[in-house]
Amino acid sequence: MKKKPTINNLKELKASGYSTLSVKDELSKNLSELIKTGKPTFPNIYGYENTVIPDLERAILSKHNINFLGLRGQAKTRLARMIINLLDEWIPVIKGSEINDDPLNPISSYGKNIIAENGDNTQIEWMHKSDRFYEKLATPDVTVSDLIGDVDPIKAASLKLSYADERVIHFGMIPRANRCIFVINELPDLQARIQVSLFSILEEKEIQIRGFKLRIPLDLQFIFTANPEDYTNRGSIVTPLKDRIGSQIITHYPHTLSIAKKITSQESDVKASNIYLSLIHI
């Protein structure tokens, strides 16, 4: 792991020549460089070398939001988690920002006000790529407040602010994942009205809370997972949301017994000498 940079304020950051990339640009650039080295892009994922992984590489290079569609145990979530390895090691954020504001391009009122007050003396901190992964399991009880946020009426009253003012919002998981990868597992389980709330974020990069529209250009890489069996058992993905997901990647079970045995060997935790894994010797 690269050492954490020692730059502590905006002046030093500007002097270093640092330039900002969006999350999708980061992933695309780093994947392109990795492919050129000839190293495996997603190591220890067996059976997908000529199917899923090339599709995933194309989706990342195309800067698409991604949906993994497949049955249980097909490494959908594992692949999603491995994508963080393609992020830059460290990125700067404005110290104290709830939504990981970029010091060179803040999007929240907090970030803009801090820079207006402190200028080049604005304090920054560094965020490691391992902290840039957010994951939410879609369940029927998930609400818009959980994902996007809600108006805090107490804060609005105490500060005498309009409900349309960004400062009265309690941000949900998605805004807090700004400049990160956000994974929603089992997307069909998410209620249709909750899926609808994602439209403007995916397309216009706006968030809408209780009818108030705020132009906050969030920078996110969305990854979804879905099981086709869930379409009949519990729910479905609404069509307009499908249209906003750039790439749908179909996963599958191993095509050969040798690959299946290799995966079983990798996933088994056989430590005691008296345990015999007969499948490997079939």
Give a label for each model feature.
Residues 150-154, 260-274:
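Conserved AAA+ ATPase "sensor/coupling" helix adjacent to the nucleotide-binding pocket
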Residues 201, 273-277:
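A short, hydrophobic/aromatic-rich structural module that often spans a beta strand
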Residues 280-282:
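Conserved small/polar residues in nucleotide/adenosyl-binding loops
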Residues 56, 277-278:
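Internal, conserved structured core segments that host functional sites
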Residues 2-256:
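Conserved ASCE/P-loop NTPase catalytic core
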